[in-house]
Amino acid sequence: MSFSESTLARFATEVAKYPPEQKQSAVMACLAIVQHEQGHVSAEAENAVAAYLGMAPIAVHEVTTFYNMYNQQPVGKFKLNVCTNLPCQLRDGQSALDHVCQRLGVEPYGSTEDGVFTVQPSECLGACADAPVMLVNDRQMLSFMGPERMDELLDTLNAQWREKEELGEKRATLELFVYISELVAKIERLLGLSE
């Protein structure tokens, strides 16, 4: 696997933050870049990052598998991590995970058939007093996520995704219409049917 010029430039920016003999310190940043661009970090990408940083492939794999923020396989548009660590367990963390899985019809680590949601149990998210807590797409922390708030969140995310998808289809249809109209006009000009 080879990375694009822009990806390599982003890697170089991260590597430059460390002394040359410690460029392996940029491994997490490089993996985050790969995931941002590809949606997950494949074994092939791990090997390519290892080669770029001069590391053993197993060392990169250890990082990828240790942190659950790295997706080792494709995930849904919305990745939902529900904390199930002991303090959250004591404050309904497992019930929250069970509720989301039941509502979406998936098992933990599973994705919905339409590819919109992936649900994962999570280790500590650092907000034990706010349990149950959830992290959406490794970026947005949500607290006090009881069943009603979970349902509201799932409905909102699903509606946003459907709206975005619908707008994309309308845009694609419009672009196709414009393309066909331009093509017809060119053909008419070539055939001398238009001025």
Task: Label the predicted regions.
Residues 1-125, 129-130, 134-195:
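Feature of Fe-S/electron-transfer and energy-metabolism proteins
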